[in-house]
From Swiss-Prot:
Chain ranges on the Periplasmic side, renumbered to this chain: 193-222, 396-404
Single Gene Ontology MF annotation: metal ion binding
Organism per entry: Dickeya chrysanthemi
Stated name of the protein: Type II secretion system protein F
Gene: outF
Matches recorded under PROSITE patterns: T2SP_F
Phylogenetic placement of the source organism: Bacteria, Pseudomonadati, Pseudomonadota, Gammaproteobacteria, Enterobacterales
Length: 404
């Protein structure tokens, strides 16, 4: 969905303005008419499509969004502790230096002025405030501790942003190293090796096996290289199209979770996110079944989300939380034993386990990247060494013949 800024006339002919989420401008006008408003002007706020999943506002890129949301939530938590909610929202809207963020908070404030609760007002913008956010705000309003809940939300958002940034930074060096390695080997085989080997061919000298293998590899790269690249691009595009189908995506995500090394990292990422989300929802007095359902929805792996949905159904039928999580085969034994069947014990133990899961996931990422980087360097060095030896061997043989 997109976010539209509108100006409209109400039944009394007074002008009003605000934000409306809709699939299109036509849909936005229809929604405004259903509210008894006559649209005068509607402008789409670019870059504000609602994400499929994740915990973010919908203006701009995700790594900026998380920090914006954390700052907004922190400011709101500070203000609601000392000011009425309407004044706090007005102050946050005016404080923001980003027009789109300011307009959204003004729209939320307008809903609150109309008589909606803060959670209901934010729920009118699902592309900006997720179910997790709205559920926690609703729990905070019901318990009378909205400021404390908002502070937990800010902490949660910052931790999510920090983990995402850590993963991205950790992946930069291996990706760059891989691209450089492929580029260097391709240039050597397609441009350098043919010119050197051509001199040996003119000498009509019997070439060593390594040199003949190098010549074959060079010919293959020059002849079939562009086709291989084209096939790879087509394969990636086809794979992406295939993953758009739910049944194929579910099978792929299931296999991904149980691969030897990558699977452990993927499971760690998803279980850490689930534990962290369940922790913050439980501590905010959100009902357990609702907390489990929302915690599953924030996961990026479809199979993990499916299995945890089954766990939620099992708990609804009377199975203990410990047993339901055990049946998913996703969580490590220590976590299953730390989470009790009753919500009271879950509220006590999930939070530290969420911290443990974050630490374990970071350790797993460090281990995987620590193994990958030296393996890539050694492989690159081995290939370059083979190329150098394949070129030097005929030269050394030629020098030997000339000395004889």
């Amino acid at each position: 969905m997109a976010l539209f800024q509108y100006q409209a006339l109400n039944a009394q002919g007074k002008k009003s303005q605000g934000m409306q989420e809709a699939d299109s401008a036509r849909h936005a006008r229809q929604l405004l008419r259903e509210k008894g408003l006559v649209p005068v002007k509607i402008e789409e706020q670019r870059g504000e499509a609602a994400p499929r999943s994740g915990f973010s506002l919908s203006f701009g890129r995700s790594h900026r969004i998380a920090s914006d949301l954390a700052l907004l939530t922190r400011q709101l938590a500070t203000l609601v502790a000392a000011l009425p909610l309407e004044e706090a929202l007005d102050a946050v809207a005016k404080q923001s230096e980003k027009p789109k963020l300011s307009a959204l908070m003004a729209a939320v404030r307008a809903k609150v002025v109309e008589g909606h609760s803060l959670a209901e007002a934010m729920g009118n913008f699902p592309g900006s405030f997720e179910r997790l956010y709205c559920a926690m705000v609703a729990a905070g309003e019901a318990s009378g501790h909205l400021d404390a809940v908002l502070n937990r939300l800010a902490d949660y958002t910052e931790q999510r942003h920090e983990m995402r940034s850590r993963i991205q930074q950790a992946m930069i060096y291996p990706c760059v190293l891989t691209l450089v390695a492929i580029s260097v080997v391709s240039i050597l085989l397609s441009a350098v090796v043919p010119k050197v080997v051509e001199q040996f061919i003119h000498m009509k000298q019997a070439l060593p096996l390594s040199t003949r293998l190098l010549m074959s590899a060079s010919d293959a790269v020059r002849t079939y290289g562009p086709w291989v690249v084209l096939l790879l691009v087509l394969a990636i595009m086809g794979f992406r199209v295939l993953l758009r189908q739910e049944k194929h995506r579910l099978v792929f995500h299931r296999r991904l979770l149980f691969l030897p090394v990558v699977g452990r990292v993927a499971r760690g990422l998803n279980t850490a996110r689930y534990a962290r989300t369940l922790s913050i929802l439980n501590s905010s007095a959100v009902p357990l079944l609702q907390a489990m359902r929302i915690s599953g929805d924030v996961l990026t792996n479809d199979y993990a989300r499916f299995r945890l949905g089954q766990a939620t159904d099992a708990v609804r039928e009377g199975v203990t939380l410990h047993k339901a999580l055990e049946q998913t085969a996703l969580f490590p034994p220590m976590m299953r034993h730390m989470i009790a069947s009753e919500r009271r014990r879950a509220r006590r133990h999930v939070n530290p386990r969420g911290d443990n899961q974050d630490r374990e996931f970071s350790a797993q990422m460090t281990l995987v990247l620590g193994l990958f980087e030296p393996l890539l360097v050694v492989s690159m060095a081995g290939i370059v060494l083979f190329i150098v030896l394949a070129i030097l061997q005929p030269i050394l043989q030629l020098n030997t013949l000339m000395s004889m």
